[in-house]
Amino acid sequence: DVYKRQGMDVVRVNSAHVTEDGATHIVETVHRVNPAIPIMIDTKGPEIRVTTIADEYGNSINFRVGDRVAVRGSDGSDMTTRKVVYMNVPTIVRDIPVGARMLIADGELEIRVVEKTDEELICEFVVGGAMRSRKSVNVPAVSIDLPSVTEKDRRFIEWAVKNDVDFIAHSFVRSAKDIKAVQEILDAHGSKIKIISKIENQEGLDNIDEIIEASYGIMVARGDLGVELPAEAIPNTQRRIVEKCICAKRPVIIATQMLYSMVKSPRPTRAEVSDVASAIYERVDAVMLSDETAMGDYPVESVETMARVAREIERDETHFKPMIDMDMVSVNHEITAQLARSAVRASTNLPIKYVVLDTKTGRTGRYLAAFRGRKTVMAVCYQLHAQRILALSYGVVPILRNQELHDKYHFLVDALEFLDQYRKLKGEDLLAIVGGSFGPDGGASYVEIANVDNIRRRNEEIVAAQKC
């Protein structure tokens, strides 16, 4: 609850570092404190790792530049030695060509393939150091045949369905095929969980358009991505992904080391503040903390700092102009998207206080977010899941209304009374209202602009006429 008051919108749980029982405890605790807080679970994803170091070497094996080793595939049972480095992918030798670079432990060690046989790769150390058990391996620019969903991922996805989770952040997504594999599991259980694809490797970048199309949202996970790409390439890569996501009406999250020094320090570095600010200037939907809140000494201060930076940057009205003229994917063929654009345009040209909408699924709220309007979108949700998923959308404040209404005028008046509990309204306040047809087809069907007094007066006239 302290995190929520400081500005947290979503709780993320990384399945790579927690058991199912531990994750269940986290979810139950969060929803006991506040049922409206969404939960995102990260899958571990398909990874290449060095196997366990043989006991005779202790905790690590030291290699120097120029040392040669054989690399072989394994089911994980073989132990790595000074002569043979085993990796947990049985077919790895088949997929990696001579000349390929292999980065171990986030690039702390690097080997290059100089020879290849049917059974092994002969590799030479380009960057030496201490190799430890279970360290990650990246192979830039090489496509390796890995499963879309590991057995552990499958168990956690099924756990997520049973435990009222809202988002699955799938790790190391390489193509739309990986997302479809997760979606098939969700569909088999009739789940509404939304998939966030984590972009962490070159293959994911190469297929970014199809990944965006197949996903609910995107996370730019700069840690592993920074291993495969040169550091100087990350800012432009991040910016291009953000632009593509906004055009496709997909929420986009920036993650990894945003306030990393706050793991040990109560204050961030100036460079970290600038990093957070840059992401906000790019108009991302969310910025994310990892180690800062998972294992840091100053978790509450980290959340408060990030929220404070975001509020300060968003005061810059000269930069944060609505994106109503952008060429957005499919917008010309979707009534909801056109009405959302009209509402944001009106809120730009008129002294509108809030954009107000009612939504069952959250789709209209997501479309309004895509146009990046300056005015807060107050989304009246009739389902808890819709309220939770809209917490990840730009500029949207989702609030839950348990009672669903069935006509336009009752919705307007009821929404005003309900919103007045959250944001005090004045009679002269002008609102842009985006509503649905209240019929079986769903979706937005009208935009109305009116002040609070006129809406209330009109409703009184309708009620009086109904009594006659």
Model regions and ranges:
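Structural preference for beta-strand elements that scaffold enzyme active sites
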Residues: 10-12, 36-40, 68, 120-122, ...
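Conserved alpha/beta-domain cores
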Residues: 145-256, 262-273, 280
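Nucleotide-binding motor/catalytic cores of P-loop/tubulin-like NTPases across gene-expression machines
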Residues: 364-366, 372-411
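C-terminal helical cap(s) of enzyme catalytic domains, especially alpha/beta-barrels
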Residues: 26-30, 293-314, 445-450
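Short, small-residue-biased leader/transition segments that mark boundaries at the very start
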Residues: 2-3
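Beta-strand/loop-dominated core regions that host nucleotide or nucleotide-derived cofactor-binding catalytic loops
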Residues: 28, 45, 50-157, 397-400, ...
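Long, charged amphipathic helices and adjacent flexible linkers at domain junctions
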Residues: 180, 196, 305-343, 460-467
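Glycine-rich phosphate-binding active-site loops on the catalytic face of alpha/beta enzymes
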Residues: 9-20, 169-172, 218-229, 276-299
